[in-house]
Structures are given as C-alpha cells and as structure tokens.
Amino acid sequence: MNLQHHFLIAMPALQDPIFRRSVVYICEHNQDGAMGIIVNKPLENLQIEGILEKLKITPEPRDSAIRLDKAVMLGGPLAEDRGFILHTPPSRFASSIRISDNTVITTSRDVLETLGTQQQPSDVLVALGYASWDKGQLEQELLDNAWLTAPADLNILFKTPIAERWREAAKLIGIDILTMPGVAGHA
C-alpha cells in the first residue's frame, strides 16, 4: 500500500488537537515511513503576504489579480519554522520534488519569490511544519481506525474552502463524515 498523493482524513474519534478533523496530504510514503502536510488547519492571523513581508520578499512585478491573503496552514507538528509549498507544476525551483503528475512540493525560497507575480504556479498552498510517521506507524494508525484514506483531489487541495475540506475529502469515498459516530468498530 502506497499512500503518496492521497489524503488521510481524520476519523471523528481522533481527538489529538493538531490532527482533530484534519486532512493530511501525503507527500511521501515508503517502507521507511510517511511524510505529509495538513491542508485544512490555518495558522491564526498569518497569510501568504505576511510570510513574504517577514522574509523581505516583494513580488516584482506585482500582479494585483493574484491574491496573497490566503491563509498559511499549520502543516504539522514538526519543523514548524520551515516552509513547505504545495503547488501545481512546473517544478523549476531549486528544491522541488514531484509528488504526482499534478502536484509538487518545494522548500526553497525561489518559489516564494514568484508568489504574487505571473511566474507563480497556478495553484499554491503554503504551510509551516509537516507531519511524519515512522516505519509501520501510519499502517498501525490505519488499523486502529484513526484515519480514512482517499486519492488526493486537486480541487479539494487548492480550491475548496478550508473549513469544508475535511467533509469534502471524506465525500470522495462516499462518506458523510459529519454523520459518523465518534468511534468506529472493527468488523
């Protein structure tokens, strides 16, 4: 089972404050573990324009049609001071890894320098921090009914309003997560 380019959808019983009602986009999953970015937990009072200001990046030439007031996500509990940018191709940046045909993750400053200009990727999600699982840990959490999984959907990843992503991700597999009981049993 490889869950790269899939969503992890927190089950209603998962009460960890960081992962409660979260949708995690899995960037890498292999025999050594998994790494992902939470895509529906906005950081309070932090937008993309705020990140650019802190890093003293001024979009040149600025395209006023491109909004920089999108929320920055809490990507996970690890390395919360590091930026991770999920975006659509191209992956012409210094530190980019292609996750799927339509999704790239970049950690280098050069992608930030394109934000707000015509050179920015068409779809962008900026996060601080990431989530990871050791070898076998994610698989055990799946057996413990902590998560649902669904193939990733770019519309949910980039365009669905943040507050609706948890429910919409579950709908990908035909589940209305808001009607599920708090604890699912094993069959």
From Swiss-Prot:
GO CC annotations on file: cytosol
Annotated signal peptide: none
Pfam families the UniProt entry points to: DUF179
Family matches, as InterPro entries: AlgH-like
Similarity remark: Belongs to the UPF0301 (AlgH) family.
Name of the molecule in the record: UPF0301 protein YqgE
Organism field: Salmonella typhimurium (strain LT2 / SGSC1412 / ATCC 700720)
Lineage: Bacteria, Pseudomonadati, Pseudomonadota, Gammaproteobacteria, Enterobacterales
Gene: yqgE
